[in-house]
Amino acid sequence: MSDKSIEGLIKRLASTSPNPDYLDDENALKCCRLALDACEQGNYGVAALLLNERREVVAQAENRVFSQGYNSSAHAEMILIDQLEQGSLGHSPAQLTMLVSLEPCPMCLSRLLLSGIGSVRFIANDSDGGMISRLNSYPPAWRNLVQLQNHYRAHVSEPVLKIAEDLAAMNLANLRHKLFMHIGS
């Protein structure tokens, strides 16, 4: 059984090397390191990378929902889309791929569809909040947009997948409590 504490995840990340048999392992590990930083800062353990056609990182972000009080839009994907839309990245959206450590939520996926980013890859499934696995639940106009973007699971090794899953689950009960305290439920 793997250690799912912050210290355990730090050790697991440090001892996990990218497996060359898995196309996304190297960038997925970079993404997981960012997600770990988000956890250490008291945020959800989620991060995202924007990759060019050569799979080089052109921008990166981590979840910052609780970094400065509360910002519901400070998901990693949203931060990167903001940078892209401000023109600060200098890349055509259609040529980019977003690699996310956790399946995007409905808010992020809707924004991704409108961004023009060519492809979205995610490392870990989000059975409670992920939207890519529920694409058919979108209204018809949104389903048309879905056809303009590629969506798929990242090609990662089992150790990298488990790290991403454990990061996404890190301190989840406490984070949900903070969220509900903020929204008054």
Can you say where each PLM-predicted feature lies in the sequence?
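Short, ordered coil/turn segments that flank beta-strands lining enzyme active or ligand-binding pockets
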Residues: Q41, E53-R54
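A short, polar/charged loop-to-alpha-helix boundary motif
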Residues: V65-I79
